[in-house]
């Protein structure tokens, strides 16, 4: 890559220099003008001149990341011993090491003949040196001695999300529902920072479960920025590039045309979120032919809410909130829409998942399957309704045939949203009474009536409280317009 266009900050604070801590919500104010002089060099063979691969800012000064010698990193990893090996892939190997100050680090040694070349090495150093957020992995430094290319990260003790979802040994406890929602919300915040805070926006392009690393308390951080691209600026709607990424996670429009947008990342996020919910791999060749692709398996199930409970990860053993499952699947389905324009922006996904993550579930509470919860229109989840109300007010959607097909549902949602945002109404008719009340079939009719009224009163109080939460969120955010419709949540 011969030229790296202007890369500025959407935040006010200036990033700390060196390999120190990262400041949430801020990014560097500097602009990067050049990372190399010859595109063919950066993509081709390795240059022995170290200076040719040191990223520099607009003033020609090396960027803030610490520069290590190969000797220092060899000592940190005990000369790259096998017992320090954390993992390996097409890019090379990752080792655990300890710096002279005792700090634990992860050292990624790039394979000189591997998939990640000099261009990807430079991009990753640049991105992680200039972007600072609590949900992005911290780059401590790098090494460009001779033909050696190494990256030094903070050590993430719990490994990757993939390690906790797939091929789990019998003696390992699977992730519970609360932790899964927490990881999803945190990863979405990292993606939101790249899309909305970085200026120009950054498209991650390789969002997958193996690139989400977990720290103490299962705190998620995005890693591996070698494929990241600067997003479109000005009047441009997309950037065109050769198709890169991982099969099973790539958005269909990007895979077919090479046209990349932030919505391409949203699709990839939907795949990972579906992995969290179902426990299935994005691509699993051990499954029957029709179930090998996770998204292809899930699409028909999205249209039948009665099948939603069967989509939950069997390792959860039923320990999840039924309503939370419906809401989570609605968010995943919206992210996975085939048309990029109809997917939500990641900021909207963050709002929805922050709500889901705040609704902690007691794993000792048995799952209650409501008869009407899976089949009646009243069982529509609130997260889906929240996205739908923004879509219904879109001028493009109001002119679409799908709007006419929805019929009375449209006016119902408009009335519900109006009452929700104004804080008026009983709460039950604000689209938030998704859990139907089943009266007691035992005892006298009067007794059954009292039980139903008491239960409905409790539901109303809960609905009003949650309506206020959604109302405040929607007022604080400018909801984007989306074109098209989402049939699976309208059925």
Curated annotation (Swiss-Prot):
Sorted alphabetically, the Gene Ontology cellular component annotations on this record are: plasma membrane
Q: Which residues form the Protein kinase domain?
A: 80-356
Where is region (Disordered) located? 1-55, 361-380, 385-491
Q: Which residues carry this modification: Phosphoserine?
A: 240
Catalytic residues at 206
| Ranges of compositional bias, category Low complexity | 418-429
Q: Which reaction does it catalyse?
A: L-seryl-[protein] + ATP = O-phospho-L-seryl-[protein] + ADP + H(+); L-threonyl-[protein] + ATP = O-phospho-L-threonyl-[protein] + ADP + H(+)
Q: Which UniProt keywords apply?
A: ATP-binding, Cell membrane, Immunity, Innate immunity, Kinase, Membrane, Nucleotide-binding, Phosphoprotein, Plant defense, Serine/threonine-protein kinase, Transferase
Task: Give the bilayer topology.
Answer: Peripheral membrane protein
Q: Per UniProt, what is one Pfam family of this protein?
A: PK_Tyr_Ser-Thr
Task: List compositional bias (Basic and acidic residues) regions by residue number.
Answer: 13-54, 402-417, 451-465
Q: EC number(s) in its UniProt entry?
A: 2.7.11.1
What outcome follows a substitution of residue 108 to E?
Loss of kinase activity
Q: How does it assemble?
A: Interacts with CERK1.
What role is this protein assigned? Functions as an immediate downstream signaling partner of CERK1 in the microbial peptidoglycans (PGNs) and fungal chitin signaling pathways that mediate innate immunity. Is required for chitin-induced activation of MPK3 and MPK6. Participates in the activation of defense genes during response to PGN and chitin.
Kindly provide the name given to this protein in its UniProt entry: Receptor-like cytoplasmic kinase 185
Q: Which organism is it from?
A: Oryza sativa subsp. japonica (Rice)
Gene designation: RLCK185
């Amino acid at each position: 890559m011969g030229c790296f266009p202007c890369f500025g900050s959407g935040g006010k604070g200036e990033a700390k220099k060196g390999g120190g801590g990262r400041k949430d919500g801020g990014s560097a104010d500097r602009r990067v003008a050049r990372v190399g002089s010859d595109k063919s060099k950066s993509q081709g063979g390795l240059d022995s001149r170290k200076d040719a691969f040191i990223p520099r800012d607009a003033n020609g000064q090396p960027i803030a990341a610490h520069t290590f010698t190969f000797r220092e990193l060899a000592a940190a990893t005990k000369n790259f011993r096998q017992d320090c090996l954390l993992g390996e892939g097409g890019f090379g190997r990752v080792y655990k090491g300890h710096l002279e100050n005792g700090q634990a680090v992860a050292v990624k040694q790039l394979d000189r003949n591997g998939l990640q070349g000099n261009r990807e090495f430079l991009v990753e150093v640049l991105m992680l040196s200039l972007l600072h957020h609590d949900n992005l992995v911290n780059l401590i430094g790098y090494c460009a001695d001779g033909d050696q290319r190494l990256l030094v990260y903070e050590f993430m003790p719990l490994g990757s999300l993939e390690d906790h979802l797939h091929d789990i040994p019998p003696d390992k406890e699977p992730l519970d529902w609360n932790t899964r929602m927490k990881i999803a919300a945190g990863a979405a915040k990292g993606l939101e920072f790249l899309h909305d805070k970085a200026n120009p926006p950054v498209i991650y392009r390789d969002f997958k479960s193996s690139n989400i690393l977990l720290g103490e308390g299962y705190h998620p951080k995005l890693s591996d920025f070698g494929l990241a691209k600067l997003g479109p600026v000005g009047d441009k709607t997309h950037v065109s590039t050769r198709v890169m990424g991982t099969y099973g996670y790539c958005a269909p429009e990007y895979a077919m045309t090479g046209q990349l947008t932030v919505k391409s990342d949203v699709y990839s996020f939907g795949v990972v979120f579906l992995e969290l919910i179902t426990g299935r791999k994005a691509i699993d060749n051990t499954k029957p032919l029709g179930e090998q692709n996770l998204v292809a398996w899930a699409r028909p199930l999205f249209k039948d809410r009665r099948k939603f409970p069967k989509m939950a990860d069997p390792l959860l053993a039923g320990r999840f909130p039924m309503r939370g499952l419906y809401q989570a699947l609605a968010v995943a389905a919206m992210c996975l829409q085939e048309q990029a324009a109809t997917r939500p922006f990641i900021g909207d996904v963050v709002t929805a998942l922050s709500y889901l993550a705040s609704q902690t579930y007691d794993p000792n509470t048995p799952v209650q399957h409501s008869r009407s919860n899976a089949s009646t229109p009243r069982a529509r989840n609130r997260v889906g309704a929240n996205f739908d109300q923004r879509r219904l007010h879109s001028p493009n959607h109001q002119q679409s045939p799908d709007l006419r097909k929805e019929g009375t549902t449209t006016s119902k949602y408009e009335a519900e949203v109006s009452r929700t945002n104004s804080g008026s109404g009983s709460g039950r008719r604000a689209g938030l009474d998704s859990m139907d009340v089943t009266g007691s079939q035992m005892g006298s009719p009067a007794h059954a009536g009292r039980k139903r009224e008491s239960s409905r009163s409790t539901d109303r109080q809960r609905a009003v409280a949650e309506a206020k939460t959604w109302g405040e969120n929607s007022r604080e955010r400018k909801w984007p317009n989306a074109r098209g419709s989402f049939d699976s949540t309208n059925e």
